[in-house]
């Protein structure tokens, strides 16, 4: 096993405990990222479905708005000059909010009306009904355009977040966890080898002590048989020592 396949660490019991904790942390992180990816994917599919529905509805609304414009021009004449003259500031404005999905911030756009209708009296002479219908249709078109912009922005943001999350999951699952597992296996192998070496060393020491003891006992028996070894004195025996007189 090369050093690139595992983490460079000195094999010990403490290192084994650390690697086990890191492995558990990596597995927990992978599981959390998978749950995050699933949540993002679910929201991604919901937004995709909503985009398709909104685009289909957008086509119908824009077609209806174009017909309303043609109808209003036919009934009320060319009112573009009146519209241009009454332009002061935007009556329809956009504000942005934020939505959080599994830690990913998604922008949400909303439209709102500000001020009074500058074209309230437009078409009072003729074509008032057609102009009112025209304003309603284009107001609906603006509403759908804002909603579509919000959905598409969220779609792109989620797509990028899902890719990043999946890359992290793959990195943890196929690089980090296997590397920690190989490091842990290396530590266990080294510790087992040390235990075997220590057991073999202790066994050899015991055998050597046994040989030395047997040799000593044989030598002692031989010397006893030859009368070279005196029996040890019994310190508990009741023997009287001779009196020593000092002159």
UniProtKB/Swiss-Prot annotation:
Domain of life: Eukaryota
Recorded GO CC terms: ATPase complex; centrosome; cilium; clathrin-coated vesicle membrane; extrinsic component of synaptic vesicle membrane; nucleoplasm; plasma membrane; proton-transporting V-type ATPase complex
Intracellular or extracellular location(s): Membrane; Cytoplasmic vesicle, Clathrin-coated vesicle membrane; Cytoplasm, Cytoskeleton, Microtubule organizing center, Centrosome; Cell projection, Cilium
Coiled coil, from the record: none
Membrane protein topology class: Peripheral membrane protein
Molecular functions per Gene Ontology: proton-transporting ATPase activity, rotational mechanism
One Pfam family recorded for the sequence: ATP-synt_D
One Gene Ontology term from the biological process aspect of the record: synaptic vesicle lumen acidification
Keyword Ion transport set for record: yes
Keywords recorded for this protein, A-Z: Cell projection, Cilium biogenesis/degradation, Cytoplasm, Cytoplasmic vesicle, Cytoskeleton, Hydrogen ion transport, Ion transport, Membrane, Transport
Subunit structure, interactors included: V-ATPase is a heteromultimeric enzyme made up of two complexes: the ATP-hydrolytic V1 complex and the proton translocation V0 complex. The V1 complex consists of three catalytic AB heterodimers that form a heterohexamer, three peripheral stalks each consisting of EG heterodimers, one central rotor including subunits D and F, and the regulatory subunits C and H. The proton translocation complex V0 consists of the proton transport subunit a, a ring of proteolipid subunits c9c'', rotary subunit d, subunits e and f, and the accessory subunits ATP6AP1/Ac45 and ATP6AP2/PRR. Interacts with SNX10.
Function: Subunit of the V1 complex of vacuolar(H+)-ATPase (V-ATPase), a multisubunit enzyme composed of a peripheral complex (V1) that hydrolyzes ATP and a membrane integral complex (V0) that translocates protons. V-ATPase is responsible for acidifying and maintaining the pH of intracellular compartments and in some cell types, is targeted to the plasma membrane, where it is responsible for acidifying the extracellular environment. May play a role in cilium biogenesis through regulation of the transport and the localization of proteins to the cilium.
Homology family: Belongs to the V-ATPase D subunit family.
Name of this protein: V-type proton ATPase subunit D
Organism from which the protein derives: Mus musculus (Mouse)
Gene from which this protein is expressed: Atp6v1d
């Amino acid at each position: 096993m090369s050093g690139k396949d595992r983490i460079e660490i000195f094999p010990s019991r403490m290192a084994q405990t650390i690697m086990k904790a890191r492995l558990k942390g990596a597995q927990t992180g992978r599981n959390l990222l998978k749950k995050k990816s699933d949540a993002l994917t679910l929201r991604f599919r919901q937004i995709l479905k909503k985009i398709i529905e909104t685009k289909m509805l957008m086509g119908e609304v824009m077609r209806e708005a174009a017909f309303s414009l043609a109808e209003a021009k036919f009934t009320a004449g060319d009112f573009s000059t009146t519209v241009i003259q009454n332009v002061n500031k935007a009556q329809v404005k956009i504000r942005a909010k934020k939505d959080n999905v599994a830690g990913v911030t998604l922008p949400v756009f909303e439209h709102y009306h500000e001020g009074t209708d500058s074209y309230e009296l437009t078409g009072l002479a003729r074509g008032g009904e057609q102009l009112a219908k025209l304003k309603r249709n284009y107001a609906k078109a603006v509403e759908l355009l804002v909603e579509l912009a919000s959905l598409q922005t969220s779609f792109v943001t989620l797509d990028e977040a899902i890719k990043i999350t999946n890359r992290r999951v793959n990195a943890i699952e196929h690089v980090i966890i296997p590397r920690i597992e190989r490091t842990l296996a290396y530590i266990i192998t080294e510790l087992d080898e040390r235990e075997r070496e220590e057991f073999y060393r202790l066994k050899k020491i015991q055998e050597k002590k046994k040989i030395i003891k047997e040799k000593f006992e044989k030598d002692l028996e031989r010397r006893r048989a030859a009368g070279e070894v005196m029996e040890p004195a019994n310190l508990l025996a009741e023997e009287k020592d001779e009196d020593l007189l000092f002159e």
